[in-house]
């Protein structure tokens, strides 16, 4: 009992936050669903993604990429402002963009103003209340190690963040290397704190201070294990006395 109380005093709050954040990961009662309408990607693209926007063949696109010393291993289609683009990725994860037209030259990223104009169309009557280019990670946009939670999602820098004055306080993150858009409304930002932060302590200064983060996670996990194990032992002893 004494050890259970001691471990509980030191690690009880951490253990509770992990239990609570684990519950939040299930989105109970859909509390993190804002009800906001889905993004109208066709409005962002100014058209529907189809082969008509890609008059340049894949073979010629590969030749154009390779002519600049870039050797793609994967190609994606992107439509922006009604114009087709090939997004090429090499075996190192680097990317280049090529307009799907004759005599086009590969380039690294879309223009910021082009992306902002296209993204604004997504939100209809709502206009950006703030626009910023992130060159460093922050509490809402950050990269995790590949083997950790959400680490498989690549978060490149810089990116464009647009904050809107709509009813859902929507933020858009636009990747200039691909033109891809992700949405983060007020409900998802709350989820970021109640689930992701409390569950993995993925605060950017901590993530940048490994192995400090690893050491804390090991200590917290061991403490939580001792609280749980000592509680099981106490419960088992009481059960034995009742059954005796």
PLM features: residue spans?
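Conserved histidines in hydrophobic membrane contexts and catalytic metal-binding motifs
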Residues: 1-244
């Amino acid at each position: 009992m004494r050890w259970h109380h001691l471990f509980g005093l030191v690690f009880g709050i951490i253990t509770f936050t992990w239990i609570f954040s684990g519950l939040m990961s299930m989105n109970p009662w859909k509390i993190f669903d804002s009800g906001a309408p889905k993004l109208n990607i066709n409005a962002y693209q100014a058209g529907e993604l189809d082969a008509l926007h890609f008059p340049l063949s894949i073979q010629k696109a590969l030749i154009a990429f390779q002519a600049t010393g870039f050797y793609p291993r994967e190609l994606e289609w992107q439509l922006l402002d009604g114009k087709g683009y090939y997004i090429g990725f090499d075996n190192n994860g680097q990317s280049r963009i090529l307009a799907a037209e004759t005599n086009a030259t590969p380039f690294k990223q879309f223009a910021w103003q082009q992306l902002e104009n296209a993204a604004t169309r997504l939100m209809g009557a709502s206009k950006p209340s703030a626009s910023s280019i992130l060159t460093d990670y922050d509490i809402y946009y950050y990269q995790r190690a590949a083997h950790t939670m959400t680490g498989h999602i690549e978060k490149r820098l810089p990116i464009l963040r647009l904050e809107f004055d709509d009813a859902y306080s929507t933020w858009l993150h636009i990747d200039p290397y691909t033109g891809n858009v992700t949405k983060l409304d007020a409900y998802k930002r709350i989820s970021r704190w109640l689930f992701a932060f409390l569950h993995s302590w993925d605060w950017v200064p901590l993530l940048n201070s490994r192995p400090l983060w690893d050491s804390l996670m090991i200590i917290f996990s061991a403490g939580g294990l001792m609280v749980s194990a000592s509680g099981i032992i106490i419960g088992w002893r009481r059960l034995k006395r009742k059954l005796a």
